Amino acid sequence: MSSSNLRVALVGSTGYTALEVARLLLTHPGADLVVATSRQDEGKPLSEIHPMLAGRCDVTLQPLDADVIAKSADVAMCCLPHGASAESVKQLAEAGMRVIDFSADFRLSSLETYQHWYGVKHPWPERIGDVVYGMPEFFADEIRSADIVANPGCYPTSAIMPLAPLVKAGLIETDDIIVDSKSGVSGAGRSPKLGTLYCETNESISAYAVGTHRHAPEIADLVERIAGAPIEVMFTPHLTPMDRGILSTIYVKPVGKAGSVEDAVRAMMSLLRDTYSDQPCVHVVDHLPATKYVAGTNHVQISVRPSGKRAVIVCAIDNLTKGASGAAVQNMNVMFGLPETAGLLM
């Protein structure tokens, strides 16, 4: 630990995303985990909650006190659930800290949309639509000066990355987009639930939250913000019997002027390559992406294929890394002028 390193506080430390943050910071050359909080496990070492950290991280869990944390850390990563997170983010920001929020509390641009989909009263409504969305590939300039960054959702990351450039360029129809996503079980969190028990998930794939998943409005909202055009998206998530990873298969219609579907796909691949040519974490590839190719990394793999009258986009990410904690470390690096990929397995 260097005295000149960035000091990181982890708020809400018992879940998988918190473990992933701690894991990534272990090898970060310019940042150290110095504070970790938990209401239920105060006084315990973080390594007791996450045995993977035994012998490598000796931080003791403490209660959340924003003023105390602000004296010890430069940035807070808030890994609390929606509703509870916004209140803690407010306290930390008012104590003078810069904050990266893992919840959905500040991702959407509309308070009405947030309250409709999440069913809670927002404790800091004046910041809705004001907080920067944490996708450096599109918002790096805003992230550099942000006091709060809304870390993207995992499914939305796998959909926004390929869709936003194509919508912005006018290469696909915007009123008929189908996003079919498969996720590992870690995406459901660490708290025990019937639906994520081994006997329920092993050797089974199941759709869930059909037509009601809260990431659908996030996908539509962010594509419109980036591309400047509204979209209609049908989003269906599935739970798969693997620990981590997301594979999104996205069905789109090329615009009528694009010529053949094959020509349209070539144009899409070319545009995506140009868009992400300088982005270290996003790769437009000729092979079909798979979750195994990006597991444990901050990489995104995207490819496009023709199929009948549609183009089929395939995008793979690790839901815990680029879909959560890796993106947070990437955002932290941008916020504090560190190399963008520092601490990330590249």
From Swiss-Prot:
Entry superkingdom: Bacteria
Pathway listed: Amino-acid biosynthesis; L-arginine biosynthesis; N(2)-acetyl-L-ornithine from L-glutamate: step 3/4
A GO biological-process term: L-arginine biosynthetic process
Catalytic class of the enzyme: oxidoreductase
Active-site residues (renumbered): 154
MF terms (GO), sorted A to Z: N-acetyl-gamma-glutamyl-phosphate reductase activity; NAD binding; NADP+ binding
Keyword Amino-acid biosynthesis: yes
A GO term from the CC aspect: cytoplasm
Family annotation (SMART domains): Semialdhyde_dh
Alphabetic keyword roster: Amino-acid biosynthesis, Arginine biosynthesis, Cytoplasm, NADP, Oxidoreductase
Catalyzed reactions per annotation: N-acetyl-L-glutamate 5-semialdehyde + phosphate + NADP(+) = N-acetyl-L-glutamyl 5-phosphate + NADPH + H(+)
Gene3D superfamilies, alphabetized: Dihydrodipicolinate Reductase, domain 2, NAD(P)-binding Rossmann-like Domain
Subcellular location: Cytoplasm
EC number annotated for this UniProt entry: 1.2.1.38
Family under the similarity heading: Belongs to the NAGSA dehydrogenase family. Type 1 subfamily.
The protein's role, per its UniProt record: Catalyzes the NADPH-dependent reduction of N-acetyl-5-glutamyl phosphate to yield N-acetyl-L-glutamate 5-semialdehyde.
The protein's name in its UniProt record: N-acetyl-gamma-glutamyl-phosphate reductase
Organism: Rhodopirellula baltica (strain DSM 10527 / NCIMB 13988 / SH1)
